[in-house]
């Protein structure tokens, strides 16, 4: 088992929640706590994210291996943003342990290398990493603005969020991720792709996943990229999907 922090909320069929960039598990999925009335929510903190020890780099392939190891029994897998890419990779590694797969706006930009809007967006993100502020707080604000996140970080950053901002600066960018669409397409478990209806870039990525994986598709507006922060609207979509996938 990977030596990363995991919290357990509620009881019921297991649902493994994988956070994205900036915020760790509990902060990312706080609005999903009501679902613990029906589900055993397994909330992971990826490597380098508080309260785990600091790490030198954030890598979706390493994280996918960690998440795959946590799939010790059949469970539902849910990933947000960077964690959505992680979840896609992990599900392909251990498909027999996945009851269903849900991803929220995964930045799998490599799926659309010839789409000019997606390509320009990914290039701009890489320029932010190459030329953006060295100060973690300033970089965090620039990143949040770029991706359209609903997160508003406090000023000054508390130690936990500062640690997360520091690992963000050393994140392996997801345009390098190679999503195994063929493997995932052949898996029997149902898939759900969720977007926030705020970005043609993320909509395009989600549309490709819907088509290639024969996935269900949902749009939950109101919180930009941070779709799960809408609370009840997102929870209703997720609960209905999970219940049907039992």
Language model regions located:
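Conserved HGGG/HGGXW glycine-rich cap/lid loop of the alpha/beta-hydrolase fold
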Residues: 1-53
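Active-site loop/oxyanion-hole signature of alpha/beta-hydrolase fold enzymes
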Residues: 42-78
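Glycine-rich His-Gly loop
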Residues: 17-21, 81, 196
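Catalytic active-site module of serine/aspartate enzymes centered on a nucleophile-bearing elbow/loop
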Residues: 213-246
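Conserved hydrolase catalytic core segment
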Residues: 74-112
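Helix-rich cap/lid subdomain of alpha/beta-hydrolase
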Residues: 106-158
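Conserved serine/cysteine hydrolase catalytic core
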Residues: 156-222
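Short beta-to-alpha linker loops that shape the active-site pocket of alpha/beta-hydrolase fold enzymes
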Residues: 45-49, 107, 221-223
């Amino acid at each position: 088992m990977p030596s990363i922090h995991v919290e357990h909320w509620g009881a019921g069929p297991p649902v493994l929640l994988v956070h994205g960039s900036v915020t760790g598990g509990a902060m990312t999925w706080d609005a999903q706590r009501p679902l613990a009335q029906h589900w055993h929510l397994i909330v992971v903190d990826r490597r380098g994210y508080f309260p785990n020890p600091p790490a030198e780099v954030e890598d979706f392939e390493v994280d996918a291996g960690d998440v795959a190891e946590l799939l010790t029994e059949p469970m539902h897998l849910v990933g947000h943003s960077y964690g959505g890419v992680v979840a896609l990779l992990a599900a392909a590694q251990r498909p027999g342990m996945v009851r269903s797969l849900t991803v929220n706006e995964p930045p799998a930009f490599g799926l659309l290398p010839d789409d000019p809007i997606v390509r320009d967006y990914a290039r701009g993100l890489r320029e932010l990493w190459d030329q953006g502020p060295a100060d973690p707080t300033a970089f965090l604000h620039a990143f949040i603005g770029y991706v359209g996140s609903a997160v508003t970080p406090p000023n000054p950053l508390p130690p936990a969020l500062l640690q997360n901002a520091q690992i963000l600066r050393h994140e392996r960018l997801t345009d390098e991720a190679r999503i195994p669409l063929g493997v995932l397409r052949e898996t029997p478990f149902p898939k759900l792709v969720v977007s926030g209806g705020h970005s043609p870039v993320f909509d395009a990525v989600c549309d490709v996943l819907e088509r290639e994986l024969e996935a269900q598709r949902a749009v939950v507006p109101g919180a930009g990229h941070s779709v799960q922060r809408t609370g009840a609207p997102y929870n209703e979509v997720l609960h209905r999907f999970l219940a049907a996938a039992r």
